[in-house]
């Protein structure tokens, strides 16, 4: 398949600028993607023509904003092949999504000595929340190393699961190496031991077709700004069983 690179670049206004008298070349999409004109236009239109509180009013603009908001939830559910729109929690990104799981699901059911299994290739968004839980409740983090090629062996993750393990939390694709992790195999092995699985899908959702129904994971977190969407946007898929166990981690 061939791509018209000039046409693709033309979709991104920022790529028309120059840096040091040369056309801008941006190679940091792994951290955050630039925004195409369609996204910029949609955000501008939202503030200029459609803005109001979501789920907080009965007037025209509030109903319109709510309809748009719920439309996004439906699109995310289809994008991830979630069984239901009710499985999608919209948030500010993967970091908030993982914190939702840490404080709204893990903290109420974990005590000192309980274990969380992580790989050493995790992004800080999938490390720091668990360190906070370790400091607050004395949970134990078990680390699984990668091989010489930077690959994560699913069996090593499964073997790390013990009788006190309460959660496995792994990335689907490394933000540093680009390594793709077989989270379907990890999920199957973890579930055979009665342990839920959280997947950090920040990178994989951009590059791979994601089917949470096929993967079987309990949680799958994504970030909008890496998917060419606005900053401060994201979502987490939570399966029906885990959703019933979730508690709000913020109030107001």
Could you tell me what each predicted segment is?
Residues 1-252:
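Pyridoxal 5′-phosphate
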């Amino acid at each position: 398949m061939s791509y018209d690179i000039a046409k693709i670049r033309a979709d991104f206004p920022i790529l028309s600028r120059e840096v040091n008298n040369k056309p801008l070349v941006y190679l940091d999409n792994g951290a955050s993607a630039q925004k195409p004109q369609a996204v910029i236009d949609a955000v501008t239109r939202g503030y200029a023509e459609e803005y109001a509180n979501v789920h907080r009013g009965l007037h025209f603009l509030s109903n319109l904003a709510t309809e748009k908001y719920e439309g996004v939830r439906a699109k995310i559910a289809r994008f991830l092949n979630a069984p239901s729109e009710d499985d999608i929690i919209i948030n500010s990104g993967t970091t908030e999504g993982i914190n939702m799981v840490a404080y709204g699901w893990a903290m109420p059911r974990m005590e000192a000595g309980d274990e969380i299994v992580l790989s050493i290739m995790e992004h800080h968004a999938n490390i720091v929340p668990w360190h906070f839980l370790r400091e607050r409740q004395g949970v134990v983090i078990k680390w699984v190393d990668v091989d010489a090629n930077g690959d994560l062996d699913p069996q090593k993750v499964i073997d790390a699961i013990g009788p006190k393990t309460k959660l496995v939390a792994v990335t689907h694709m490394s933000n540093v190496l680009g390594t793709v992790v077989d989270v379907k195999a990890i999920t199957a092995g973890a579930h055979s031991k009665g342990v839920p699985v959280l997947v950090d899908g920040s990178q994989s959702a951009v590059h791979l077709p994601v089917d949470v129904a096929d993967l079987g994971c309990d949680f799958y977190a994504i970030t909008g700004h890496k998917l060419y969407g606005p900053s401060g946007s994201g979502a987490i898929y939570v399966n029906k069983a885990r959703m019933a166990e979730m508690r709000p981690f913020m109030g107001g």
